[in-house]
Swiss-Prot record:
UniProt name for this protein: Flavin-dependent halogenase radH
Pathway(s) annotated for this protein in UniProt: Secondary metabolite biosynthesis
Alphabetical list of InterPro entries matching this protein: FAD/NAD-bd_sf (IPR036188), Flavin-dep_Halogenase_NPB (IPR050816), Flavin_halogenase (IPR006905)
Applied relevance: Radicicol is an important pharmacophore as an inhibitor of heat shock protein 90 (Hsp90), an ATP-dependent chaperone involved in the post-translational maturation and stabilization of over one hundred proteins, and which activity has been implicated in diverse pathologies ranging from oncology to neurodegenerative and infectious diseases.
Binding site for chloride: S330, G331
Binding site for FAD: G14, A17, E47
Disruption phenotype: Abolishes the production of radicicol and accumulates 6-dechloro-radicicol, also known as monocillin I.
Biological classification of the source: Eukaryota, Fungi, Dikarya, Ascomycota, Pezizomycotina
One BP annotation, GO: secondary metabolite biosynthetic process
Amino acid sequence: MSIPKSCEVLVAGGGPAGSYAASALAREGVDVVLLEADKHPRYHIGESMLPSIRPLLRFIDLEETFEKHGFQKKLGAAFKLTAKREGYTDFVAAHGPNGYSWNVVRSESDELLFKHAAKSGALTFQGVKVDSLEFEPYDSDFPSGGKVANPGRPVAARWSAKDGRSGTISFQYLVDATGRAGITSTKYLKNRKFNEGLKNLAIWGYYKGARPWAEGTPRENQPYFEGMRDGAGWCWTIPLHNGTVSVGAVLRSDLFFAKKKSLGEDVTNAMIMAECMKLCPTIKELLEPAELVSDIKQATDYSYSASAYAGPYFRIVGDAGCFIDPFFSSGHHLAMAGALAAAVSIRASMKGDCSEYEASNWHARKVDEGYTLFLLVVMAALKQIRMQEEPVLSDIDDDGFDRAFQFLKPVIQGSGSAEIVKRFTKKEVSEAIDFAVLALDNMAGAGEHANETNGSNGTGETNGDAKTLENITVEDEKVLSGIRILAKVAPSADMKDLEGTAIDGFMPRLEHGHLGLNRV
């Protein structure tokens, strides 16, 4: 099948975000073309999911396919931030016997999503990369600012295929799901900004024969995340259904290179991995009988966001817009929730539920709120890891840690905003997010993210004056805005928070055949 000359919606990128957006739109009868630069199945890191993924899959009739595929069930997860003890999030206790999520082999799960887009009615093409976009001026009452931009209206994309073909496709709407390449943000808007406190580097590999965590208990073989004892970062073990365990380490890039230098000229990533494991004694013990069955891979793991996630007739989703440290497995949730927001807002614009500006703004705000929520909880955990003995979250004793960990649980478990409102006092939230002031500024109305006023020059680079994660503080009013964020956008395992959340006077209408926005 040849790539058509035109379509209603072009989705650039066939990862989880792009495939989900294509499915959601095609199921509404929209003429969708999905272009993926690579060919499935293809390798990707990011194997652990939150329970909030289930209702998102259910909405496009893909939950049962995931259930039957045989992925490793994720009943919960353990997090050991300090040397004292671990906290555990129990998905099944929170949501019932079917409240679990999965650990996935990404080559398999991403292919399921991509194929489902075709089953839903999208025209899908692999090995086809979007190289450039063509814009036309768009001055129709569409001001830049907030989380939207107006570089003009994208009307066509130039593409090239691995088999040597090339061409142009015109469209009415664009969904940019081009992953970290982020063609719209990096090439045209030039608005990607890195979080100076989360400039990390990851190394990882796959093992066989590891001991399961919590063997002989109901928590046996669940994912385990452990902070390094020197505060440099954290390590993970994620069991997979193919008999391997994904094991990796995420640490500050400056400390990674310091470790590398200290080990001498002939250092390998395997040697650095071994040094990291020494600082995570529980994981080190689990790996004692295990055998490494892959190379040790390496990638930058910088967290970033953007000043805009939408504009005239385009939406940015998934890693194309923002990426956050994967400590709490937020990637799939943010990708699919953002993709659904794109589909909702595009249908709203198409059907006249609201203006294109209002639809774009709703999408951009939805993406930004999700990113900010996970930024808060990730920074809370990572600050505790880096400070180790200092009680960032609460008193570091057994009871105190359990109380502090309740701050994180509703977000990780997908318990929704009601649980957060019930559980926390101003003091508890203050202890957890006092370092996140600049991330909160945007939600409080200042319109800026942490790195935009804390060391970023607006070009994706950072200067040397940025505060470290350990030193950021916040005033009381910003703490209160943090409570509002948590109360408003915490993910839910039944999508009730997405359906019941109004942004600028609009609520999503999640009905098949009637997808869009309702004015409230």
